[in-house]
Amino acid sequence: MKTGKANAVARAEQARAAGFVAPHTSPNPVDDATAPTWAQSGDRVTTAQGLRIDDADNSLKAGVRGPTLMDDFHLREKITHFDHERIPERIVHARGAAAHGIFEATDGLEDICAAAFLRRGAMSPSFTRFSTVAGSRGSADTARDVRGFATKFYTAEGNFDLVGNNIPVFFIQDGLKFPDFVHSVKPEPDREIPQAASAHDTFWDFVSLQPESTHMLMWVMSDRAIPRSYATMEGFGVHTFRLSNAKGETSLVKWHWKPTAGIHSLVWQESQKLGGIDPDYHRRDLHARIATGGFPQYELGVQVMPDTPDQTFEGIDLLDPTKLVPEELCPVRPVGTLTLNRNPDNFFAETEQVAFHPGHLVPGIAITDDPLLQARLFSYLDTQISRLGGPNFSQIPINRPLAPVNDNNRDGISQHAVHVGTTPYTPNSLGGGCPFARPDGTAYTHPPVAMERNATKIKLRPASFDDHYSQATLFYRSLSPIEQLHVAQAFSFELGKCVSPGIQARMIANLGNVDADLADTVAAHLGTTAPAGKVVDPDVVSEALSQTRPQDPIVSGRMVAILADEDTTAKLVNAYRTAADPLGVEVIVIGPHFGKLASGLPIDRSAHISDPVEYDGVVLATEPDEVTTTFVQEAFRHHKTIGVADSAMAEALNLPVNAAGVTLTPADFFEALGRHRHWNR
């Protein structure tokens, strides 16, 4: 019998024989050049102090069967570190996935913004984190929820963080209500349920008493809250920001991210099933797209509005975070392209420890007096200190700027820098006057903004904040009939989970001020009636708010299932693969078992572990049986593209022969796949 030491030696020899030394990957572009390049080096197990260990399998004991000895310093060090490996999760946005990328200012904003990274042709490394809001770290990706969309730009002038969501508005107008909102949507404190879900009494109790939430609720109950992929999800800065150019001229802007792959969502049944079948669905999808070279891309744009004294545009208060500016009134101006091209090397070190903050600004970009944004400036900085163990979180590699740092900050928990000199203060003479501040055109300058004349301290909101329903109506009326149906079904589902009938009644009354038909539909589902409301009909509708509007037929990153059996020919499967490869579509062959089919065709997945909700389209490459018929029919119910051999096979599957999205050839199949869903059948 080999001893633990002999086993360790054997494993080491096997590793060296295989040419393996250490799991080194590409260095993080923001690593400090003076720090060790790798977290691990060499091929021997050591302690944290670099001491080589002769046996990593057995504790030190008094005899072979004796008690473990406390003088086993390696055991104590290893267990102690293990006991402290977890840090507090984010209070919100705990569940997330991220990727490195590169941002190129293809169009530039020099005329309105002095930021160097927004000059035409400038390129900046970046790190983007997507997330859900309500759920814990271990919750499912596909829950109905707002999605975070936060990007850190490592620019020559310092880090700039664009900390947004996939919805352009928010639930509340003032940051004072943020803890109340979060407490309401989190699991109820007596039972700690439900997880990652808003379908419960406390959430709807809060929002039904906060009419300002109504616009946001329309978005969250829409398909926007169940995206197909992070790569097919819009992003928004939510708030209004102030840009200034080299001349000091200012503009007000709203940030937009437009995915080049289009804007697409799951359907509700898919979202629910995927939560059990693959709770890591979005995380897995993002990683796979990047690993296979199908890099997600987003166009950054801004809506540019004049910086007027009242900070309004076309009657819309730009300081109200529950309001948007329709793109038909103010088109989005292209700025540049973000390409996510590298997966993190380590989830904890990068995705978990990245610290975003809306106050991480660069010259030319400033915040406004939006009361929710003002509170976020405090909250984001404060929470990092708790979550990351102290004030030195900016020294963590993923958070380090590329720009030189000389901030006079010293000491504190987890101080990684070794500061030299004796003058961590400004001004000084002993250090030659360094570091010093100088307004030389390269430093950050707050744009001068006139304050309200004779302003008094007061706890009030402007009257323009009182309109809580008109934009909710605008959003709902801008949706297609199928999207409106989904909104009504989502409200019915969520409110149906509430125990208190008073909550349901209040929310139905609120919906009556948005759209009478919507309120009546939800009320009927709940077995009640809706009171008459006061609906303000919008002057226009916004086509940009609908996901079913015509979009470019991009299919890159989609997954297609080919259902095969022993009678399936490799020729048929290869015909679909040949058509799919140049389009960036992944084809998965699903068979009755693992291994190969009689034709020698490899099987990627077994039918026993596959479900149609995982795929964007389905091809039946064999005669239908009970399993494949159920598979195809469910995909059809979800309005997906279906490929069959002929009309007889479609009839055998009980599918309408001439239904939209039911195709007979690879060419027709992939053309139909570009429409994402076929809502007209």
Which residue stretches match the model-derived regions?
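A short helix-to-beta-strand connector/capping loop
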Residues: 601, 657-661
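Structural alpha-beta junctions
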Residues: 581-588, 637-641, 657-658
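A short, aliphatic-rich alpha-helical micro-motif
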Residues: 612-613
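A charged, well-structured terminal subsegment
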Residues: 660-681
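Short secondary-structure capping/turn micro-motifs that flank functional sites
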Residues: 595-597, 627, 651-652
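Catalytic nucleophile loop
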Residues: 500, 617-622, 630-654
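Active-site-adjacent core segments of small-molecule enzymes
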Residues: 2-567, 574-582, 586, 591-609, ...
